[in-house]
Amino acid sequence: YYLGPDFDEVAVRAAMDEAGVEDWAEARHVKDIHSVIADALAGGAIVARVSGRMEFGARALGNRSILADPANPLVTHEINQRIKNRDFWMPFAPVMMRARAGDYLANPKELPSPYMMLAFEANGRHEEFIAAIHPADRTARAQLLEPGQNLGLEAILGHFGTATGRHVLLNTSYNLHGSPIASGPREALDTFRRSGLRCLALDSWWLRKKDGTQP
């Protein structure tokens, strides 16, 4: 799943110093970054998460991702227009634990989908993740997370589910349209600075742009 480059705390601090983060964002090192992310998502924030080894493959699977609450249909416009700068009609995908798939998707064969490569029809609870399904036919190209596949993302889903009663998130790659996915801390901070994102979880660092900061 995660065979790409990794980074350490030294690289994070060096990248933040180089980017002059203190001038345009508030940054704090937190012990339980996963609960901080989940609380922000439950409060309506859109959060970029950069942690651990990068994904190797066609999809962002949580370590170089933008996450949001898919129950809010307005996040589709927000991410497309203000963050990723891409066409309005381009859909997003959901991520959930595989054990929760039956709550949201029609998957009679109980197929695994750890790489976000299979499409499923949404079931009657589609309003709970309306921003992460295709609006034309209510299908979803879902990432069904296996236990232990990504402990951090699993923890975020767990905290978010406890806070909201919904056990699904919107997951899309952390990049601007036409640019590669952010790899390490330098790219993560550059993308953060140039996008309309307000929140970034960079390993165990929580960054929020200061009021008035423009991309």
Task: Kindly label every feature range from the protein language model.
Residues 1-215:
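Flexible beta->alpha loop and helix N-cap segments adjacent to enzyme active/binding sites
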